[in-house]
């Protein structure tokens, strides 16, 4: 099945990914999948109480989607550390920064392999990880220890390796938060962070890991709800034609999937 074979309504549906109700799959979920042909669903730990319940829910979503032409994206935020959406039976990985600061590339690879395998075994096919932002502040904040390093080289070496290991398990790895969330302490879940750094400097630092990841085969990229004034004076990155249309699609010739961060945050 190729996109050209879909109806207009089906193409529109593919643009959306929904969050399940806290109680799980309900009539509204079924309607969104079967009537509106949505592209996928993201799971949170609030949606299940056990590993068995999680797997059962994933299988139900796939069964509900059988009437559609394209498989459902079943996604999760599984970074390790404080961003852990797996049930309590699954031992969580350490956070990205602690793993990367060992400078043990084999350990980094192993963390990506384990992450990918645990998701594959559940039936999940998309992971919103790794974070390719650069850690710039010592204290814990919105991004902090979710990063793989404090400079471009560390983030590219360790973050992109994790991306590759997730991919090797057949999971789509969504790198985030383009064009870089590391220069602000503000949490984009609650505020619209504004970055005023010169574009030339951003291109050499925060933006660079994303370009490198694309060159090395990134499947998908998440665009953050971040206002980068020197790249687009008016719109946040997630709504910016200059950042998505011009930078990603035209300048970098990126053909992969582009996803926004959660629209509820806007």
What are these regions (language model features)?
Residues 1-38:
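N-terminal basic, low-complexity leaders that serve as flexible interaction/assembly modules and, when applicable
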Residues 7, 19, 25, 47-66, ...:
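Second-shell residues forming the walls of enzyme active-site clefts
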Residues 21-35, 107-118, 203-210:
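Short, acidic/polar
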Residues 53-63, 105-121:
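Active-site-adjacent structural elements in enzyme catalytic domains
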Residues 86-91, 125-145, 176-193, 224:
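Active-site-proximal loop/short-helix segments
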Residues 90-103, 147-149:
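A charged helix-plus-loop insertion that forms the helical arch/lid used to bind
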